[in-house]
Amino acid sequence: MFEVTKKATFAAAHFLREYQGPCSRLHGHNWTVEVTIRAPKVDKMGMVVDFMDLGRALDELLEMVDHRNLNEIPPFTEVNPTSENLAAWFHQELDRRLAPQGIHPHVVRIWEMPDCSAAYWKE
């Protein structure tokens, strides 16, 4: 089994609805998103995925969230923009963009602080 990972960072604000504590107020993070792709074999070029293709798909999503209030971006207008929900959203959106190439994310991990992360993967 092969595994490749791509990381990217973005700055964004959010607040948590119905939360009791300081995170209920608008605040920001320098987030890191980490995308891992797994495959049982490499292609004829010797790659699981071209990092350029993965980077382009990730950049499309980063453009939507960077320097924004996440609560103003669907689905986070209705769903709390927690690290868990962000990880699931990135996973689903990357899968939608990469599936036509036969590429599917294995796991997406979101870091909202250097020591706090959440991950999403399909079983």
Predicted regions and their residues:
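Charge-rich, low-complexity N-terminal segments
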Residues: 1-123
